[in-house]
Structures are given as C-alpha cells and as structure tokens.
Amino acid sequence: MWPQLLLLLLAPRSGHGCQGPELDRELVLAKVRALFLDALGPPAVTGEGGDPGVRRLPRRHAVGGFMRRGSEPEEEDVSQAILFPATGARCGDEPAAGELAREAEEGLFTYVFRPSQHTRSRQVTSAQLWFHTGLDRQGMAAANSSGPLLDLLALSSRGPVAVPMSLGQAPPRWAVLHLAASALPLLTHPVLVLLLRCPLCSCSARPEATPFLVAHTRARPPSGGERARRSTAPLPWPWSPAALRLLQRPPEEPAVHADCHRASLNISFQELGWDRWIVHPPSFIFHYCHGGCGLPTLPNLPLSVPGAPPTPVQPLLLVPGAQPCCAALPGTMRSLRVRTTSDGGYSFKYETVPNLLTQHCACI
C-alpha cells in the first residue's frame, strides 16, 4: 500500500511534464558551456593551467581591460587655447595712443588677458607668449649681444614680479616666450596683466601684429576622494543594463512562474572561466524556457457560447499521446556574437554562437 502511494505522489501530473522550481544556476551554466563548446569548439590551450596565454602588455591591454568593439583606445583629455589681449587701447586709438606711445618709447608694453573658465579649471602644461618685435634676424642678434632683449613681468598685489621664461624658435620679426613651469599658474587667474619690456621694439597697431598667448591644458587629475571611489573593489561579475532592468522589476507572484515562461539569467564569461578566451562582451543575459504546461484559460477572450465554460488553450504541435513541454518556438532563437582570442590579446576573432538566446516560449 505505502509503495503505491509514494509512486502516486511522485508521479508528474498530466500536462505538467516540465513543471518544477526554477532551474539551478549550475545546471544552466553547464548547459551554456555545452552550447558554446558545441558552436566554437574548446579554447586553445597555450599557457599553464589550461587557459589561453596572457599577453604581457600595459594595464590598458590586460585581462578585463579590453577595448569595446568599434572604439579606439581612450585618449588623454588635452586641449589648446589661444588668448588675445582683452579689448582695450591700442597704438592707433585715441586718447590712449599718447600714453601707449610713451610706454613704447620706454620699451614697456602692457597686455591684459582674461583666461576662460574652461582654461582656469584645467591644468596648464605649457604656455607661450607670441610677441611681434618688428626686428629682423640681424636686429635680434645685435640686441641679444648687448643684453637681454625681452623681459617679462606680471602684475600682482605686490606690484610687478618677474616671470621666468625662455626664448624659443620664432618666425621673422616675432619672439616666442616659453613660460617656465612655475609661471603656468598665472593662467588660472581671471585676469592676467603682463608687462613686456623690449627697448628696441616699436608699438604696432596692425591687427596681424597683435600678441597672443598659447596655452596647452589637460584635465586635472582626480582628487583623493575620487581616486578612492574609483578604487572600490569590483563586483563579482560584470553587470549589464539588461541585468539592472531585471533587478528593478517589481516583484511578481510565485504563481506567475508556475506556467511556461521565459526565464533570464545574467552570465559572465569570468564565471564560466573563459574571460581569457571570450573577451567581449564580458557578460550577457541568457534566456531559456521553463515552467509547467497545464491548460490555462485566457480570461480576456469572449465566450464562444453564452453560458459555456471558457475554452482551454491548446498546446502547440501536440502529438497524440505525447506530453507537452515548455520549449522555445522553432525559428525564434537568436545568435550571440562574441570576440575571442587564442594568444592572450595579440589577435582577435569574431565568432557567432547560433540559436543561443530564446525569444518566445510555448508548450510544444
């Protein structure tokens, strides 16, 4: 009596051959491994421990830092800004022309620059002041032989202070003053007043002789707090937007998952042990069919005959005598395109795993 009762309790109910709790994750991973190996074959073993060899490259190319498909290596955030003197008096303007002419006779030229907010917010790596001297090469050589041709000063709260600089290569009748590293913070001020002393230079009102500053900048390095945030330990496996959407869904009743449905699982190739073989994407959402194949009714369908009970939904492609099972609809499976390497990153290969991702499930 008791053995017969036990067999009756363990026997599956009619029409629910695939019913049961959600599949164990290890079972799903084993199935995924089999599908990949069947489509791509086993990975090439070139290193110790059964994994493809690791290419010894800088950190940017190390495992876990592979470039995204269609993207270029990350470039440093650098820029160049050209600053002209703020609008004001020039040699040809009146009534300031007399004052500027007197300054020119003394060999002192005053220029006011207003660096932009973008320039002030960045780290200045180099800066050059281009100044039109009006002297040819012979005149420049004669002036340099008798003493320094150019002196550069900056106006501060303590008065004019010398700006360390050096002369570089320049076109004829021009001088290029390279500011020293200690003078670069001057370009982080809202207003920069430069005083240039050149006894042999003349003041020119021509637009093409306007002096200008060239500043090369880059993004400031992250602060200590930002570096600490960036150094936070990584998650056990890479997340994807699809995985986050799954987590953000409202909870569903357990009964919803009792019948045939499409289940999802976020799988990373690191979890599969293939992160040195399959380098992109780092993870994907694996869809599979699961659930029972009872004969539920559709409450939204109208009754065919008034007073008659609802018509049950018939399983698809049901052969007489066969038991329906929750499975993917034929012809609706999608492929997954991956990028693999067999030499640790020296070369890559694009491959396709066909019929991997389930789109629609039904009792078949």
UniProtKB/Swiss-Prot annotation:
The record marks 60-61, 230-231 as: Cleavage. Keywords: Cleavage on pair of basic residues, Disulfide bond, Glycoprotein, Growth factor, Hormone, Secreted, Signal. Its main location: secreted. It comes from the Eukaryota. It is found in: Secreted. InterPro entries: Cystine-knot_cytokine, Inhibin_asu, TGF-b_C, TGF-beta-rel, TGFb_CS. One of its GO terms (cellular component) is extracellular space. Disulfide bonds join 260-326, 289-361, 293-363. GO terms for molecular function: cytokine activity; growth factor activity; hormone activity. PANTHER family: INHIBIN ALPHA CHAIN, TGF-BETA FAMILY. This is Inhibin alpha chain.
